[in-house]
Amino acid sequence: MSQQTPQESEQTTAKEQDLDQESVLSNIDFNTDLNHNLNLSEYCISSDAGTEKMDSDEEKSLANLPELKYAPKLSSLVKQETLTESLKRPHEDEKEAIDEAKKMKVPGENEDESKEEEKSQELEEAIDSKEKSTDARDEQGDEGDNEEENNEEDNENENEHTAPPALVMPSPIEMEEQRMTALKEITDIEYKFAQLRQKLYDNQLVRLQTELQMCLEGSHPELQVYYSKIAAIRDYKLHRAYQRQKYELSCINTETIATRTFIHQDFHKKVTDLRARLLNRTTQTWYDINKERRDMDIVIPDVNYHVPIKLDNKTLSCITGYASAAQLCYPGEPVAEDLACESIEYRYRANPVDKLEVIVDRMRLNNEISDLEGLRKYFHSFPGAPELNPLRDSEINDDFHQWAQ
């Protein structure tokens, strides 16, 4: 092909710019129509913790799909990169950035924007020239690889010699077709992925529903283990509670028996003590009554030895002044045996016995005995009853003291 003049190249670039603008408008209109017609949110499912658990099983399920079984592998579609291709990538990235900047522009911009477009076109032409030079070098080095590559390189070399330095862009119809096909493939992939994810969610939901039904029926193994542990703990606590109750009841029974025994023994002790006191009191009363009855039965008392006690103005010694009156003893001083045997309650510090009265009593007794002996000796009989002696003052006082007690 013949080389183009600079004017023709400028005209072609202007036409391409117009086509690019039309393609951008068509893209915008198509995107708006697509957004109205297709609602991709219906195929999207919110991700959760379940999606993180997709492992080798999901990969196997993806591999088993009929659509992907006969699909070509990615490694067969992608050519192995060479050093030159890796060097091309930065330039291609710059080119794509410029194209995107172009597409984002809308007709009707000001002159500054047109100047910026011209500058971007110049940069693209420089990048294309660099890429073509690197492609030519790489194609010359890789001629011996295979026949197809050689043919492609020859075609590219011819195109390089014949093609103008201006950027060759595909037609808008082809771009629309490519975009439509790509969009259709992407939507198909998204739809299949959504179906797969929904299937996985359904399987997981079925498994969870099955476990829930097993839990409701009580046949879940983990739930059975948990119930068995709870039952074991409950039985242990019940056993301890029963043992504690049994021990407390035994303690209460022992305490009750001990209390009843104590009350019974105390009752018997009180009854025994009361019986003993009543018997002692009754016996003492009985002896007192009998003694008084015997005393009342005695009309003439027996002649007993009497120890006279010194009494002021009553006994013989005190009356005649033979001896002074006796003085009372202090509490705790001992009592003479002759007084104790006579049950004399008068206690004196000095000798309380009236010796003069004792002598007189002995003289009287001796006189009575001599008289009786004379009667027996001379008269051989008792002429009459003897004269009875009256009560002494000491005996009267003793009787008064007993009545006062």
Swiss-Prot record:
The modification Phosphoserine is found at residues 56, 120, 370. Transmembrane segments: none annotated. InterPro entries: Sds3 (IPR013907). Residues 140-157 have a biased composition (Acidic residues). GO terms for biological process: cellular response to heat; negative regulation of inositol biosynthetic process; negative regulation of phosphatidylcholine biosynthetic process; negative regulation of phosphatidylserine biosynthetic process; negative regulation of rDNA heterochromatin formation; negative regulation of silent mating-type cassette heterochromatin formation; negative regulation of transcription by RNA polymerase II; nucleosome assembly. Pfam families: Sds3. The keyword Nucleus applies. The keyword Transmembrane does not apply. It is found in: Cytoplasm; Nucleus. One of its GO terms (molecular function) is histone deacetylase binding. Keywords: Chromatin regulator, Cytoplasm, Nucleus, Phosphoprotein, Repressor, Transcription, Transcription regulation. Residues 1-26, 49-171 are annotated as: Disordered. Residues 1-12 have a biased composition (Low complexity). Residues 86-108, 116-139 have a biased composition (Basic and acidic residues). GO terms for cellular component: mitochondrion; nucleus; Rpd3L complex; Rpd3L-Expanded complex; Sin3-type complex. It comes from the Eukaryota. Component of the RPD3C(L) complex composed of at least ASH1, CTI6, DEP1, PHO23, RPD3, RXT2, RXT3, SAP30, SDS3, SIN3, UME1 and UME6. Component of the RPD3C(L) histone deacetylase complex (HDAC) responsible for the deacetylation of lysine residues on the N-terminal part of the core histones (H2A, H2B, H3 and H4). Histone deacetylation gives a tag for epigenetic repression and plays an important role in transcriptional regulation, cell cycle progression and developmental events. This is Transcriptional regulatory protein DEP1. It comes from Saccharomyces cerevisiae (strain ATCC 204508 / S288c) (Baker's yeast).
